[in-house]
C-alpha cells in the first residue's frame, strides 16, 4: 500500500482490531532499535458518542508513536447539514460513512487501511483485501479486482480510492491470541471495571448523560467489561471479573 499509493492512511479507533493493525504496521516499519516512524497518518472518525476512556487511549497511543492524527468529526457533518439525525441521542454509526468520505476528500487520501474482518458480518465477508471504491466512495462488487495469491492491484484513477483490510481473514480468536502473545495494550474498558448500569431489555446499559437512567429504573454498580468499543448509544458491557484477554 505504502509503495504503490500516493497518500495512504491507517484507520485507528482505539478498538482491539485497530490496535492489532497498528502493531503490524509498526513491525513493518521498524528499523533496528530506532523509534518507529509511520510514513502515513492515523485517521479516526469521531462520532462524539465515544467512551472517554477510548479517546484517551487513542491520544496516548498517537503520542507514544509521535504519529500524525487526522480526526473527522460527525458533529461537523451535522453542522454542515450533510448528516441529519432525528434526535441527539440517535446512533451515529451509519452517519460515520458520510464523515469518512468527507475526511477522505478533504485530505486527499487514496488508500485507507482498516481492521475490518470477514467474520464480523455478511457485508464485510464479501469484501476483498483490496476493496476498490469509485470517485463517489461507492463499493460495487462487480468492479472489484482479482486477488491471486498475494498479488494485489492498487492502481487508481484520480478521485478513486482503496480500502485495504490486511487482517480481513483473521478471526476474533486470532485477534485475542495475537493481543495476548504480543502483550498489546488496550483501552481499560476491555477489562473488568466498576460501572454504574441499569438492567434494560436483558442488557446492562451504562448510565451516562447520553443513556440516562429512566424514572422507573434502579441503577447498580457492577463489575463489567466491554467486548467492543463502539458508541455509548449502542454498546453495552457484560458482567465480568476478567482482568485479562
Spans of model-derived segments:
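Nucleotide-activated chemistry modules centered on ATP-dependent adenylation/adenylyltransferase
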Residues: 1-11, 16-245
